[in-house]
Amino acid sequence: MFKNALRRAGVAAPRISRVAQRGYAEAKATPTEVTSILEERIRGVSGEANLNETGRVLSVGDGIARVFGLNNIQAEELVEFASGVKGMALNLEAGQVGIVLFGSDRLVKEGETVKRSGSIVDVPVGPALLGRVVDALGNPIDGKGPIETEFRIRAQVKAPGILPRTSVNEPMQTGLKAVDALVPIGRGQRELIIGDRQTGKTQIAIDTILNQKRWNYGQDEKKKLYCVYVAVGQKRSTVAQLVQTLEHHDALKYSIIVAATASEAAPLQYLAPFTGTAMGEWFRDNGKGALIVFDDLSKQAVAYRQMSLLLRRPPGREAYPGDVFYLHSRLLERAAKMNEREGGGSLTALPIIETQGGDVSAYIPTNVISITDGQIFLEAELFYKGIRPAINVGLSVSRVGSAAQVKAMKQVAGSLKLFLAQYREVAAFAQFGSDLDASTKQTLTRGERLTLLLKQKQASPMSSEEMVPLIYAGVNGYIDNIPVKQVEKFEAEFVSYLHANESDLLKDIAATGELSKENLEKLKSITENFVGSFAK
């Protein structure tokens, strides 16, 4: 009406200026348009900026920065903010890039410039890292100065294909009687260590590293096994204690420690296992043997879940992203035994998973069990009873390790696992206190002593030639009449007796890796004589 009245009066209607129109549109902008408005304003501010190579921070918080620009960026490329903080591009979306920060997000401000580095996350590798403690990006954190190495490898690379691999056929000895006899591990295998918190999972891994000392200070390069220990989400005091233990036992010289502790940003905890694997792969690809321990992958999965949810990726079971299986499979598939044409190197993986209340059927445990070649299941109940390592013989299995087991061990421990499983069953039944026949009593007597024989103190790994006579004595009933409280004493005295008087037999087992008929007869008479004198 107002416009018509003006027209009749011959007066032109007032025009709303474009600026006013834009202001009106912005005032009524929907939340989805806010980003494009911000982009326009940033373009206005930095008209000359090259948005292909640089960008500006739109928003930052919870360790995630959303950046406008960086049009040429690659997935998982390193970027650097003007404040000096580094990050990694994980989400490449239309109009913006989701970047996870490797430092504190308090240092990053909105509108700050971000630059491409041009390189996917890569880490230093090679023998120069042995004896060092590094962070998830390979930077030294032990105060021993910079790492002088000419080799750098991408942290995330494809696993070896099918043809370059060969089947697991060499033993990887842990020095633990319960593991080497019941769930043997071979070079190139992935053996999961799973159990509740405080059940001795890390200790099995540490003892395995300590046991490599007997070969790593020798001359035979093929027998050496270089160790990489990846600490994810652990307390700094725990990592410091581990370094101290390895130094005390002279094992740090052939080990690399990658630490992404609980106080580090989630992206670093996610990246650390890949960094450690790249370092282990250098040894594998150069015809050497390497062992990597992931302690633990549950915390890596939690860090990845945190990042994914903050990046607005859709959640799945237990709020983990849909590709959490791929996260662990692409990591563990990099452990392999290479064929002779590829140099014959190997990378053995010991991933650790922490369960809640013994629930092995949770999402992450079942994922990793299906990826690995077997698992060592540790039970809190056994641990509290003083049976350490607290390995549940019934649930623990090694799917490929038996092909790599030392022949002498296979000869003496063949029936051990089945017998211990029978003992557990009978022991549970015997609790009801019913009358037992002679054979059941015999099973209980021998089973109790065998269980004690498999116990072992921390940081005291044994060689296979020391284990074989002990397990032979236990399986064949030579210690059935020895009192339960005397089993530990028998073990110590028998081993020292063999070293003092029968060192030729031990050397022969160590050299050949098997028990000949002659040596078997010899071992039988030695054991009978020693048990007879010990009982007196």
UniProtKB/Swiss-Prot annotation:
It is a peripheral membrane protein. The keyword ATP-binding applies. Keywords: ATP synthesis, ATP-binding, CF(1), Hydrogen ion transport, Ion transport, Membrane, Mitochondrion, Mitochondrion inner membrane, Nucleotide-binding, Transit peptide, Transport. Pfam families: ATP-synt_ab, ATP-synt_ab_C, ATP-synt_ab_N. Coiled coil: none annotated. GO terms for molecular function: ADP binding; ATP binding; proton-transporting ATP synthase activity, rotational mechanism. GO terms for cellular component: mitochondrial inner membrane; proton-transporting ATP synthase complex. Residues 1-24 form a transit peptide. The keyword Cytoplasm does not apply. It is found in: Mitochondrion inner membrane. Gene3D superfamilies: 2.40.30.20, ATP synthase alpha/beta chain, C-terminal domain, P-loop containing nucleotide triphosphate hydrolases. GO terms for biological process: proton motive force-driven ATP synthesis. Its main location: mitochondrion. ATP binds at G195, D196, R197, Q198, T199, G200, K201, T202. F-type ATP synthases have 2 components, the catalytic core F(1) and the membrane-embedded component F(0), linked together by a central stalk and a peripheral stalk. The central stalk, also called rotor shaft, is often seen as part of F(1). The peripheral stalk is seen as part of F(0). F(0) contains the membrane channel next to the rotor. F-type ATP synthases form dimers but each monomer functions independently in ATP generation. Mitochondrial membrane ATP synthase (F(1)F(0) ATP synthase or Complex V) produces ATP from ADP in the presence of a proton gradient across the membrane which is generated by electron transport complexes of the respiratory chain. F-type ATP synthases consist of two structural domains, F(1) - containing the extramembraneous catalytic core, and F(0) - containing the membrane proton channel, linked together by a central stalk and a peripheral stalk. Belongs to the ATPase alpha/beta chains family. NCBIfam families: atpA, PRK13343.1. This is ATP synthase subunit alpha, mitochondrial. The gene is ATP1.
